[in-house]
Amino acid sequence: MKLTGLLFAAALLGACTQPAAEENYTRHVDPKIGTGGHGHVFVGANVPFGLVQVGPTSIPQTWDWCSGYHASDSTVIGFSHTHLSGTGIGDLFDVTVMPVTGDVTYARGTEDDPTSGLWSYADRTQEIARPGYYSVPLTRYGIRAELTATARVGLHRYTFPASDAA
C-alpha cells in the first residue's frame, strides 16, 4: 500500500512540471533570400500555402522584377495581394493600393520624373520582413506601410504623418 502511495505521489509530482519551451523556428527564416539577381522572389507578408501574398510592387525594369520586388530597387508603386515567387514571368496584373498625401497624380510615374506619378521611394534600411509581416516607410509621403497575412486574408495598415494633406 505504501508503494502505491509513493508511486501515486511521484506521478503527481511529475505531472506538475513545466513543459519545455517550444523553439520559435520563424526566427531562422530570411524572406529576402532570392529577391536579387534572377531569383524572382517577392518580399511581403504570407504564410505557407496561403491564398494571399501581400507585398510591395516596384516600377518594373526588366523581367527580374516579375515578382513585383527586386532587392536592387527601392521604388514602390503600390501594395497588392497576389504576388508570385520564382515564376520567371509576370503574374495576374495585380490591383495595387498606394497610400499618398497631398495632391494626387493618377499615373504610375517614372524614376526620371518623381512627380509624374504616385510612386515613392522605400527606405530599405528600415524595411522589416519576417514570416507573416512586412513593413516599410515610404519616403516621398512620410507614410509607414505595414502588411500582414493569414491563410486567406491580407491586411494593410498605413500610418500617415500629422498633416492636413494626409
What are these regions (language model features)?
Residues 1-9:
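Sec-dependent signal peptide recognition
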Residues 20-166:
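Accessory carbohydrate-recognition regions in carbohydrate-active enzymes
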